[in-house]
A protein has these predicted regions:
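Acidic beta-strand-to-loop metal/phosphate-binding motif
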Residues: 228-242
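Nucleic-acid enzyme cleavage-core boundary/entry regions
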Residues: 1-231, 246-368
């Protein structure tokens, strides 16, 4: 690896204990110890790009998604094969009479019945063994807990703070002070904590004269109780089943209110190369309901009903900023009931198709 201080190419022996043997200065990460792609220069480079060279601040969660070296997701697989009990329950009643017939017969009949009995037993013994079903899952390398540990322990102990422009959004992090908004003109309803911290720390709601409301999708209706009904609502959510249903259900509950869906659309990530795909452990949502309520295509509804989802926090920060800005401006000029299911998706990029029938796998920024 390359020393982040003197740029010397270091062998394993020249970087023992995360200290450069040439300049004798410590560094935080070593790919050999902390995993592929985990080195100071790469983390700094990705953080600089994410913050637009210092113009924006980003969260540790956003940096984690951007610095991942691998992500993959797989759907559930049904059980297949025959249970041993069933195999022998069928085979023994057939094989036993044949063995008896062979034992008490002579000549050709004994040979044929004996061979048939052996064939039945052999088929039962060699039949495909039952493989239990497997639930879907996903994998991101490094894991979020591991990445946070590296940032909190190794990086802070080496440099005294997180990379420039990166803020902690963990559960123990202090709350971010939000710039005051005198008379808000709109509401931004955000269901992702990392994205809400990103918006607050960059003063985006105040700049747009919007009130930021953070809530889980299931609690979104209650979170809007204290918000004046005249204010338009811009909804930010993951590309998930609950996220896709949120804006349509809010429109039904508040027919006199502008509700603009600016969440991450499934069409932008389902077949997009490089998008992060994850699998939820929550009970599946019926595909028919997703089509009827959210107006999704058959393919998108099936993808979500299989448990797949994609996090809003994985969207590049500059793209996220531009989408939120455009969505609030659009909501301010819209009329109640005039927005359809596709409105709010106009600023999101279309997905780049991937070969059908393959496991969802994406790689993060180059690990070099």
């Amino acid at each position: 690896m390359t020393c982040p201080h003197c740029a010397a190419a270091l062998t394993a022996r020249e970087r023992t204990g995360q200290v450069c043997a040439h300049c004798e200065r410590p560094f935080a990460l070593d790919p050999k110890s902390h995993g592929r792609g985990m080195n100071d220069l790469r983390i700094r480079r990705i953080a600089a790009a994410a913050t637009d060279d210092g113009r924006l601040k980003v969260t540790v969660t956003q940096l984690w998604y951007l610095t991942r070296t691998y992500s993959g997701a797989w759907g559930p697989t049904p059980a297949h094969g025959i249970r041993p009990f069933v195999r022998w329950l069928l085979a023994l009643p057939l094989a036993l009479p044949l063995f008896l017939w062979s034992a008490f017969s002579d000549g050709l009949w004994a040979t044929l019945t004996g061979a048939a009995a052996l064939a039945v037993v052999g088929t039962a013994a060699l039949a495909k063994r039952r493989t239990p079903g497997r639930s879907g899952g996903s994998l991101i390398t490094p894991a979020e807990s591991r990445f946070r540990q590296l940032m909190d322990d190794r990086w802070r102990s080496t440099y005294g703070r997180l990379p420039p422009g990166v803020v902690d959004d963990g559960p123990r992090a202090p709350a971010v002070r939000e710039s005051p908004v005198g008379r808000p003109a709109a509401v931004i309803l955000c269901t992702d904590h990392a994205v809400a911290v990103f918006l607050r720390v960059n003063g985006i709601p105040a700049r747009l004269r919007a009130r930021l409301v953070e809530a889980e999708p299931a609690a979104a209706h209650e979170a809007l109780v204290d918000v004046p009904g005249r204010l338009p609502v811009v909804v930010l959510h993951d590309a998930s089943a609950l996220g896709a249903l949120l804006a349509p259900l809010l429109r039904l509950a508040h027919p006199d209110r502008v509700v603009l869906d600016a969440g991450l659309p499934v069409t932008a990530v389902r077949n997009r190369r490089g998008a992060v795909h994850r699998v939820s452990a929550a009970p599946p949502v019926d595909a028919d309901g997703l089509r009827a309520v959210a107006g999704l295509s058959d393919e998108d509804a099936a993808w979500l009903s299989d448990g797949y989802w994609s996090p809003l926090a994985a969207v590049p920060p500059s793209r996220l900023e531009s989408v939120v800005t455009a969505a609030v401006k659009r909501a301010l000029t819209a009329r109640p009931g005039a927005l359809g299911a596709a409105d709010g998706f106009l600023t999101w990029p279309a997905g780049e198709p991937t070969p059908a029938g393959t496991t969802s796998r994406t790689k993060g920024a180059p690990a070099g």
